[in-house]
């Protein structure tokens, strides 16, 4: 074993120790550890299960806290253990044992990188599940097909992350793709990961629907908003709501239900409209639509609160509903984020859900 390799491994452990100390302060390790002990006590109370929703919230909080506290504990013990193992393997000239130490340290580095990534989740709703609205722009079949491609891209991204997805509302295009859709994404930090995807996505390609094989430009809008749990209070006056029911429809506008089970809710003071046709039960669709409305009202309030702050921050773009954020030029094999400058050439991988590079770049730059 070369001295340079041994020194490099020891330096890596020293660096990990320093980063661990920094992140303990930033993430309030002691505060989270104390809260975890409280949450564990609450979760072990048999009375908790009399309130399933509260039990679910406690379970979710416990999982998030354990993800931080136990990871930092594991990194700390791993640093000390591997320092001793380095000494032992060097003394015994145990190359196989030293290789195992190198592998374990690489694992510690990965855990630390994951924690440092979570530092970028600085909004209260970042750990929450989220909803994604996808709407085709003007342009008929071209735009509807593009909206369908985005629908698949986000579905595949969610699958890659181990998230659960639920289609709440889907209006198929006349020939291909979708006119609009709403999906619910369930998973740890789903909103934090996907929130910077809000905006207009532009596609440039040679159209498969054009017999002359001309180049076409299409647009679709994406809007991501968090699912709000009972820890965040959103007051809704029933008098402000207009509730309409209609028959759920499938491809080409054909009715797939004989009863008016689909629900559309309009919040008249803001003009926000939500709709759900996922369930055959009108009651279930209304409950789901109300959750979506609460989430959209929360997102609207957060945007209002941040408006003045964002206006003062130089270099930060307004990622509003009408802002073009990303360009997908398929014939040139180029996808570029217009806010961060991040660009890739593997268009197939991105459209198959490989969005990590774009999301990491946008979070790092505070988009």
UniProtKB/Swiss-Prot annotation:
Question: A Gene Ontology MF term for this entry?
Answer: translation release factor activity, codon specific
PROSITE patterns the UniProt entry points to = RF_PROK_I
Going by the UniProt record, its keywords in alphabetical order are: Cytoplasm, Methylation, Protein biosynthesis
- Which compartments does it reside in? Cytoplasm
Note the Pfam families from the entry.
PCRF, RF-1
Which Gene3D superfamilies does this UniProt record tie to the protein? 3.30.160.20, 3.30.70.1660, Release factor
GO annotation, cellular component aspect? cytoplasm
Question: Which residues are recorded as modified (N5-methylglutamine)?
Answer: 254
Q: Amino-acid biosynthesis: is it a keyword of this entry? A: no
The post-translation modification note in this UniProt entry reads: Methylated by PrmC. Methylation increases the termination efficiency of RF2.
Major subcellular location class: cytoplasm
What does it do? Peptide chain release factor 2 directs the termination of translation in response to the peptide chain termination codons UGA and UAA.
| NCBIfam families on file | prfB
The similarity comment for this entry is: Belongs to the prokaryotic/mitochondrial release factor family.
- The molecule here is called Peptide chain release factor 2
Q: What is the lineage of its organism?
A: Bacteria, Pseudomonadati, Pseudomonadota, Betaproteobacteria, Neisseriales
């Amino acid at each position: 074993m070369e001295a340079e390799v041994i020194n490099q491994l020891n330096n890596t452990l020293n660096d990990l120790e320093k980063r661990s100390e920094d992140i303990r302060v930033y993430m309030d390790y002691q505060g989270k550890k104390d809260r975890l002990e409280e949450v564990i006590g609450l979760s072990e109370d048999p009375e908790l299960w009399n309130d399933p929703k509260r039990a679910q919230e406690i379970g979710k909080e416990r999982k998030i806290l354990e993800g931080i506290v136990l990871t930092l504990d594991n990194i700390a013990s791993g640093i000390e253990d591997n320092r001793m193992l380095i000494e032992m393997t060097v003394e015994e000239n145990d190359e196989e044992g030293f290789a195992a130490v190198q592998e374990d340290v690489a694992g510690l580095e990965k855990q630390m990188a994951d924690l440092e990534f979570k530092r970028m989740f600085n909004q209260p709703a970042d750990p929450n599940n989220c909803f994604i609205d996808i709407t085709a722009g003007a342009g008929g079949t071209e735009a509807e097909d593009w909206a369908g491609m985005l629908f698949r891209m986000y579905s595949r991204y969610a699958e890659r992350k181990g998230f659960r997805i639920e289609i709440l509302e889907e209006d198929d295009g006349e020939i291909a793709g979708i006119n609009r859709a709403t999906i619910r994404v369930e998973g740890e930090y789903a909103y934090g990961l996907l929130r910077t995807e809000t905006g207009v996505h532009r596609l440039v390609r040679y159209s498969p629907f054009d017999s002359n094989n001309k180049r076409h430009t299409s647009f679709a809008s994406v809007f991501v908003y968090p699912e709000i749990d009972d820890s965040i209070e959103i007051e809704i006056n029933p008098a402000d709501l207009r509730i309409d029911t209609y028959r759920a429809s499938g491809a080409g506008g054909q009715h797939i239900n004989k009863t008016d089970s689909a629900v559309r809710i309009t919040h008249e003071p803001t003009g926000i409209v939500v709709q759900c046709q996922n369930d055959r039960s009108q009651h279930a669709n209304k409950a789901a639509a109300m959750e979506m409305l609460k989430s959209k009202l929360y997102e609207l309030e957060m945007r209002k609160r941040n408006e003045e702050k964002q206006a003062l921050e130089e270099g930060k773009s307004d990622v509003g509903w009408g802002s073009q954020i990303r360009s997908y030029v398929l014939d040139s094999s180029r996808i570029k984020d217009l806010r961060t400058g991040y660009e890739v050439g593997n268009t197939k991988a991105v459209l198959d859900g490989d969005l990590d590079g774009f999301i990491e770049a946008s979070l790092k730059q505070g988009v």
